[in-house]
């Protein structure tokens, strides 16, 4: 599904990504962990097409297409979804209208007609029930006045409605209490299918207690320096990142 080869990226003239290699297959959950400043959020920004970052070398292929040639909006239409660390507020635009526009943009891109109003509302209700979101949030302006937990739940609801092929959760556990964390994780787990994939970017273990990864990568100084199974999460929780840094410096 996603193939990253020797990816280098700079921001404001400083190289942040220094040769990322990674492959994500359909049906898999990958966790990317690492200390602050390692390049985790830069990687998610590059994959989703943020203008701030310049790719200087490497390739990114998504379902056979050159992802780096696509503008950000077409990457979303192709099925890439980003859950932000700090979701933005959009005053005056209700959640339900935002989602209707987004869904119909994707359908138009794929040569499909707009969703009939009745079918759309039926689908919305099914997704609300699936991820356990309060119906009151639908008619409120997108994220405006939402608590941190409500914003994150709303993003998982958006993910349920948009049905992305690849979901990137960038520090989605930031600022969540344990109940909100569990709710978000349960929603993500319910949306997992053999046809889609998820990348979970996090600094801490606790989210990965609920979303169990198939593959764990450690990102350090702009490179993936270690890849293993879920057992690596417990090792990092026990020993921190210092042993990884020492291992890298010793090479």
Task: Name these PLM-found stretches.
Residues 219, 223-245:
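Conserved beta-strand-loop-alpha-helix hinge in the C-terminal portion
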Residues 168-172, 179:
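Walker B catalytic motif
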Residues 159-160:
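ABC ATPase C-loop
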């Amino acid at each position: 599904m996603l193939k990253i080869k020797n990816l280098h990226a700079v921001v404001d003239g400083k190289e942040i990504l220094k040769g990322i290699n990674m492959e994500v297959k359909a049906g898999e959950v990958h966790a990317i962990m690492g200390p602050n400043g390692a390049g985790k959020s830069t990687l998610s920004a590059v994959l989703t097409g943020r203008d701030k970052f310049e790719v200087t070398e490497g390739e990114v292929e998504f379902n056979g297409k050159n992802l780096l040639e696509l503008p950000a909006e077409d990457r979303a239409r192709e099925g890439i979804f980003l859950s932000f660390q700090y979701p933005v507020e959009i005053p005056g635009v209700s959640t339900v209208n935002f989602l209707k526009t987004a869904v119909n943009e994707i359908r138009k891109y794929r040569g499909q007609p707009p969703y009939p109003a009745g079918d759309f509302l039926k689908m919305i209700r099914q997704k609300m029930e699936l991820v356990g979101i309060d119906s009151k949030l639908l008619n409120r302006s997108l994220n405006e006045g939402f608590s941190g937990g409500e914003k994150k739940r709303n993003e998982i609801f958006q993910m349920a409605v948009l049905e992305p092929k690849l979901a990137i959760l960038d520090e989605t556990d930031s600022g969540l209490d344990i109940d909100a964390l569990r709710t978000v994780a349960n929603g993500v787990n319910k949306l997992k299918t053999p046809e889609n994939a998820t990348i979970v970017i996090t600094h801490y273990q606790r989210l990965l207690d609920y979303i169990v990864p198939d593959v764990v990568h450690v990102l350090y100084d702009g490179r993936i320096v270690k890849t293993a199974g879920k057992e690596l999460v417990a090792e990092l929780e026990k020993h921190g990142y210092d042993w990884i840094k020492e291992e890298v410096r010793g090479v």
